[in-house]
């Protein structure tokens, strides 16, 4: 089943308005959620909407809250998200980082006490669309064991790096686990196994089974000990600069809330597109493992999915769609 982008966005907005979000805030949040599904990140669009609604009803998300300025240190602004909607707060934070970068060449904003931003790549695309290099990351609840450990003590702390490109922006959007938990949940819902080992089951054996990994909470870090180390240092950096909650503090709450996020923008008038094109051509010149296979740069597949779904409609799970219509 497929639905037009406009219809999906309209239904999101209707529900958000009924939850007492202000018009402009409902519009922005609905657009981000619909765009996530449009771009193929279904786990952070329609499929996560009911969880977001529950977080509003459970008072983890304050529909009236606006992110607020706390202090500045040169080109670094510190904000408090005031427990507002994560995607709204993140979009406003990236807007401010872009504004600073357009004036000074660099802009940085760190925010504490905010909520899940849904797809982190949204804010990389936002920066690149504005002509800026964008780097952002967030901490999360503990959902990954440190390398050598059995129990979740690290967040999968997604990292996004975006570079403007005339033929389609380059946008890397990656969790510190081999697969995000959203992707694991999506695969479980579709009764699909993961393509490569994604974590450990309850017996400590590597597995492709998303249900076993979600139950054990032992997702596999990217690059093994390297991903574990990167997840750790991102949490340290965020906590040090924002004065907000670390993964340890986030995990002391019943549900994931009060996370910290970081937004960095760089701006110059010319990004040497010919040199970037050279990197892309050279990368794609490799022989493929599978005959007729494709080598893609980060963000390329997102653009292809976006264009296809804009033309043919966004694929939706019928049960999730009916659930949305009844909200």
Residue ranges and their predicted role:
Residues 2-3, 8, 18, 241, ...:
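Catalytic-core signal marking the mid-to-C-terminal active-site face
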Residues 154, 158-161, 175, 229-245, ...:
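N-terminal nucleophile
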Residues 46-100:
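Active-site cofactor/substrate anionic-group-binding motifs, chiefly glycine-
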Residues 1-3, 10, 14-28, 34, ...:
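Acidic, glycine/proline-rich low-complexity segments that act as flexible tails and inter-domain linkers
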Residues 144-211:
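Phosphate/diphosphate-binding glycine-rich loops and adjacent basic-rich segments that engage nucleotide
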Residues 76-166:
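A generic, well-ordered mixed alpha/beta core segment in the N-terminal half of proteins
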Residues 189-250:
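Secondary-shell segments that build the walls of catalytic and ion/ligand-binding clefts
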């Amino acid at each position: 089943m497929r639905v037009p982008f406009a219809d999906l966005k309209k239904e999101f907005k209707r529900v958000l308005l009924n939850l007492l979000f202000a018009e402009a805030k409902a519009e922005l949040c609905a657009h981000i959620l619909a765009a996530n599904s449009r771009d193929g990140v279904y786990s952070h669009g329609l499929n996560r909407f009911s969880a977001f609604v529950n977080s509003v009803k459970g008072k983890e998300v304050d529909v009236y809250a606006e992110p607020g300025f706390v202090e500045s240190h040169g080109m670094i602004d510190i904000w408090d998200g005031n427990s507002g909607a994560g995607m709204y707060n993140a979009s406003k934070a990236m807007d401010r980082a872009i504004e600073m970068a357009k004036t000074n060449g660099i802009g940085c904003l760190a925010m504490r006490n905010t909520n899940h931003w849904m797809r982190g790549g949204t804010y990389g695309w936002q920066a690149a669309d504005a002509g800026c290099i964008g780097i952002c990351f967030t901490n999360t609840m503990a959902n990954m064991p440190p390398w050598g450990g059995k129990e979740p003590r690290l967040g999968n702390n997604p990292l996004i790096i975006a570079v403007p490109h005339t033929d389609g922006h380059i946008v890397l959007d990656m969790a510190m686990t081999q697969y995000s938990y959203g992707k694991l949940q999506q695969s479980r819902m579709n009764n699909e196994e993961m393509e490569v080992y994604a974590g450990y089951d309850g017996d400590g054996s590597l597995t492709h089974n998303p249900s076993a990994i979600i139950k054990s909470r032992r997702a596999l870090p990217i690059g093994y000990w390297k991903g574990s180390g990167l997840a750790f240092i991102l949490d340290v950096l965020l906590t040090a600069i924002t004065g907000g909650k670390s993964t340890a503090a986030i995990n002391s709450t019943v549900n994931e809330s009060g996370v910290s996020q970081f937004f960095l923008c760089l701006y110059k008038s010319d990004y040497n597109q010919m040199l970037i094109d050279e990197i892309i051509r050279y990368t794609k010149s490799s022989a493929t493992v599978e005959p007729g296979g494709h080598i893609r740069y980060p963000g390329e597949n997102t653009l292809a999915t976006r264009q296809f779904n804009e033309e043919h409609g966004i694929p939706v799970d019928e049960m999730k769609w009916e659930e949305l219509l009844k909200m």
